């Protein structure tokens, strides 16, 4: 991905493996990148929580890839959010969008209703670009529509890797993102049922991720809680950031793809053009002279 919209580099991810080598886990703090994305998309609180969870999930899933590989997550439900799309790479870069950012839906207990906003019926599609001719794509039905459980269900069901995922985004009364982050835990063969049960008990007794992050927990702190008394080694610490791959050159290629006649009509009817990126909100403006130069480059070929 490019570097057009990097967040302040204070968000980061930690990857570990148990000393026995049978459990791997990742945890990350994504408060700044989620806040940046939500500001760019003008999301209302429930849309902020949903997009933030999906972005954090993308960071975690991306960290399982090899350098040069990318992953795309598409959550599509029958709720008012309609669709969330997230793209991430192996280097901690992520970008995303929510099709309808103007959603603020509450549950009966007053908490943000992410599942209701996404919709109980729908699909999660995961596409991995592994550098082959075609990306590997898998689709599962939404499990709870809470994002974290849907990712865990996909990993367990579609990729046959027993997984647990926890994601959290805390949105303040003023709509700002106060905390965001999460964890992903996977059992590696041969499985140790006793150890897995022990970790599942820790997950069950764990305070909400957002509560721990607001209290100052780091990715290391989340992992230390989850793996209490279980020796592990830290394999990697990596910065994560909101990074978009859009650029003026890419937009120029899109305009060139319209063809000479379409560009001539655009010049005649509007005289200029402003093209926005749906992922980061960046706008690229083209004057009449610039559009004419693009059109003339086509006719000169």
Swiss-Prot record:
The keyword Transferase does not apply. It is found in: Cytoplasm. One of its GO terms (biological process) is protein refolding. CDD domains: Hsp33. It comes from the Bacteria. InterPro entries: Heat_shock_Hsp33, Heat_shock_Hsp33_C, Heat_shock_Hsp33_N. GO terms for cellular component: cytoplasm. Under oxidizing conditions two disulfide bonds are formed involving the reactive cysteines. Under reducing conditions zinc is bound to the reactive cysteines and the protein is inactive. One of its GO terms (molecular function) is unfolded protein binding. Keywords: Chaperone, Cytoplasm, Disulfide bond, Redox-active center, Zinc. Gene3D superfamilies: Hsp33 domain, HSP33 redox switch-like. Disulfide bonds join 244-246, 277-280. It holds the Pfam family HSP33. Its main location: cytoplasm. HAMAP family: HslO. Belongs to the HSP33 family. Redox regulated molecular chaperone. Protects both thermally unfolding and oxidatively damaged proteins from irreversible aggregation. Plays an important role in the bacterial defense system toward oxidative stress. This is 33 kDa chaperonin. It comes from Geobacter sulfurreducens (strain ATCC 51573 / DSM 12127 / PCA). The gene is hslO.
């Amino acid at each position: 991905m490019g570097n057009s919209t990097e967040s302040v580099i204070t968000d980061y991810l930690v990857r570990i493996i148990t000393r026995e080598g049978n459990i791997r886990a990742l945890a990350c703090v994504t408060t700044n990148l989620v806040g940046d994305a939500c500001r760019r998309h003008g999301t209302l609180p429930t849309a902020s929580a949903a997009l933030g969870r999906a972005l954090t999930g993308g960071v975690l899933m991306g960290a399982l890839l090899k350098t040069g590989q990318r992953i795309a997550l598409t959550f599509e439900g029958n709720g008012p959010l309609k669709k969330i799309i997230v793209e991430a790479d192996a280097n901690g870069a992520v970008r995303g969008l929510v099709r309808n950012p103007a959603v603020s839906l509450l549950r009966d207990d007053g908490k943000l209703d992410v599942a209701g906003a996404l919709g109980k019926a729908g699909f999660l599609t995961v596409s991995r670009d592994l550098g082959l001719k075609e990306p590997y794509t898998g689709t599962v039905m939404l499990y709870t529509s809470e994002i974290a459980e849907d990712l865990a269900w996909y990993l367990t069901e579609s990729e046959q890797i027993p997984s647990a995922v926890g994601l959290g985004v805390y949105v303040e009364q003023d709509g700002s993102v106060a905390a965001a982050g999460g964890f992903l835990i996977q059992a590696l063969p041969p499985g140790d049922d006793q150890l897995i049960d022990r970790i599942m008990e820790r997950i069950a007794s764990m305070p909400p991720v957002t509560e721990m992050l607001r209290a100052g927990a780091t990715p290391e702190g989340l992992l230390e809680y989850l793996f209490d008394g279980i020796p592990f080694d830290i394999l990697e610490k990596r910065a994560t950031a909101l990074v978009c791959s859009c650029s003026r050159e890419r937009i120029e290629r899109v305009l060139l793809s319209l063809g000479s006649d379409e560009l001539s009509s655009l010049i005649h009817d509007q005289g200029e053009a402003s093209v926005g990126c749906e992922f980061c909100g960046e706008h690229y403006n083209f004057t009449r002279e610039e559009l004419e130069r693009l059109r003339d480059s086509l006719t000169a070929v």
